[in-house]
Amino acid sequence: MEYLPIFIDLKNRPVLVVGGGAVAARKIHMLQRATITIVAPALCTELKKVLIKQNISWISKNFQPIMLNKVILVIVATNDSKLNTFIYQNAEKHNILINTVDDKNKCSFIFPAIIDRNPVLIGISSCGKAPILVRILREKLELLLPKSLGFVAKLAGAWRNKVKQHIVDTVLRRQFWEKIFYNGHVVTLMEKGRPKEANKVLNYALNNSVKNKNNKTGHVTLVGAGPGDIGLLTIRGLQVIQQADIILYDYLVNSDILDLARRDADKICVGKHVGNHSISQKKLNQFIVQLAQKGNKVVRLKGGDPFIFGRGGEELQAISEAGIAFQVVPGITAGIGVAAYSGIPLTHRKYAHSVVFITGHNTNGDNQFNWNSLSNNQQTLVIYMGKINAISIRNNLIIHGRNMHTPVAVISRGTYQDQKILIGTLIELEKLTQMADHPALLVIGDVVSLHSKINWFGQKALHYYLINSIINLI
């Protein structure tokens, strides 16, 4: 983070503005609560009007370093480069915050693009890197956020102390406000200009919450985080993550997804590496139950989809037996997401009429799978965690009739920017997996031959696509 985004109360604090043109006038509009002194030999018409309306001092002289005395912040809005440098050097010498308009190198702070729903304020910045992108984001957010948002915030502020007095427990208090805002009823009433009814709803909710304050019950949500790319997390998954008190996550979960959680949420890695289980499944099940019994909103965050080779069913059995409330948010499983990002359609009228998902962990045992069925040349075989037993997989498939020249893809870091795809044939599977990183997904079938024609994720236009996706999502 190049800049610290902070909101400063400038009420009655001394601020110096150097410059008397239209740019200075625009900046002064944001500093209305401050005690402003303008330094400029002459003022534009707009500033003269502002001078009459507001309590602003004007020094009709050239800038002198002594004018910085007792000032906490300086805005420089002149087109004199030498003067701007001189002011900047003096401000830096005295550790005074300074912003030189349109000259980032002479700034100790910069102004963000602002969305004002007083008292709700949103500042957006690219740290001076992409001002047009920031402008577009601001425009999108302006349309997205209701004009009544400020009234909702003021209403919440009016109730804040009363709620704090009646709900002493901080967790319960936060959950109360989450219910109010997520439910949307109060917001809708304020949008319609019906504050009296909104107050009644708040009063009813508070009384009801006080009656049930001893019934502090937690619950567990099993969430599929998708195969890696943060953009593949579902909207429902995002909502649940942002409400969680505790997140128990697998080591494969993208750290960017964890950053979406509340800052005060506990994030605990309970994942398993190949051959290295930090916690047994039985103990993990007990741990989840214990956390929920303490009244926490627990999110069990798993890579891919929790019900496909994720042991989600085992965990929910334990949670259900303990009488804990739970829900499931599906995710895009690696077999589907990674194949799509590799330009490999799992079914195709010409090449494959079915697809089978298996785990490669237990493929050493000859009786573990129906190899005759898996060796069908008209189907696609997707193998999770198949790197370790690649030799056994290859041998069993060929022995049971799969063509040794069947196209194969070994994909690691699937859906990430550094995704690695190794293409070969079934007879070469051992060599391919040796070159791949853990964990790796194996795709076996004639559909792999389409990779070279429809591998979209490696295209030059990718970055444009990603930026467009961000803007369109907002």
UniProtKB/Swiss-Prot annotation:
Reaction catalysis annotation: uroporphyrinogen III + 2 S-adenosyl-L-methionine = precorrin-2 + 2 S-adenosyl-L-homocysteine + H(+); precorrin-2 + NAD(+) = sirohydrochlorin + NADH + 2 H(+); siroheme + 2 H(+) = sirohydrochlorin + Fe(2+)
Gene3D superfamilies: Cobalt-precorrin-4 Transmethylase, Domain 1, Methyltransferase, Cobalt-precorrin-4 Transmethylase, Domain 2, NAD(P)-binding Rossmann-like Domain, Sirohaem synthase, dimerisation domain, Siroheme synthase, domain 2
A Pfam entry, by short name: NAD_binding_7
InterPro entries (alphabetical): 4pyrrol_Mease, 4pyrrol_Methylase_sf, 4pyrrole_Mease_sub1, 4pyrrole_Mease_sub2, CobA/CysG_C, NAD(P)-bd_dom_sf, Siro_Cobalamin_biosynth, Sirohaem_synt_dimer_dom_sf
Source organism, top-level taxon: Bacteria
Region (Uroporphyrinogen-III C-methyltransferase): 218-474
UniProt keyword Methyltransferase present: yes
Chain residues that bind S-adenosyl-L-methionine: P227, G303, G304, D305, I308, T333, A334, M385, G414
Phosphoserine PTM positions: S126
EC number annotated for this UniProt entry: 2.1.1.107, 1.3.1.76, 4.99.1.4
Pathway(s) annotated for this protein in UniProt: Cofactor biosynthesis; adenosylcobalamin biosynthesis; precorrin-2 from uroporphyrinogen III: step 1/1; Cofactor biosynthesis; adenosylcobalamin biosynthesis; sirohydrochlorin from precorrin-2: step 1/1; Porphyrin-containing compound metabolism; siroheme biosynthesis; precorrin-2 from uroporphyrinogen III: step 1/1; Porphyrin-containing compound metabolism; siroheme biosynthesis; siroheme from sirohydrochlorin: step 1/1
Keywords from the UniProt entry: Cobalamin biosynthesis, Lyase, Methyltransferase, Multifunctional enzyme, NAD, Oxidoreductase, Phosphoprotein, Porphyrin biosynthesis, S-adenosyl-L-methionine, Transferase
Protein residues bound to NAD(+): A22, V23, P41, A42
One example of a Gene Ontology biological process annotation: methylation
Family as reported in the entry's similarity comment: In the N-terminal section; belongs to the precorrin-2 dehydrogenase / sirohydrochlorin ferrochelatase family.
Annotated function: Then it catalyzes the NAD-dependent ring dehydrogenation of precorrin-2 to yield sirohydrochlorin. Finally, it catalyzes the ferrochelation of sirohydrochlorin to yield siroheme.
NCBIfam families: cobA_cysG_Cterm, cysG_Nterm, PRK06136.1, PRK10637.1
Protein name listed in UniProt: Siroheme synthase
Natural source organism: Blochmanniella pennsylvanica (strain BPEN)
Record lineage: Bacteria, Pseudomonadati, Pseudomonadota, Gammaproteobacteria, Enterobacterales
This protein's encoding gene: cysG
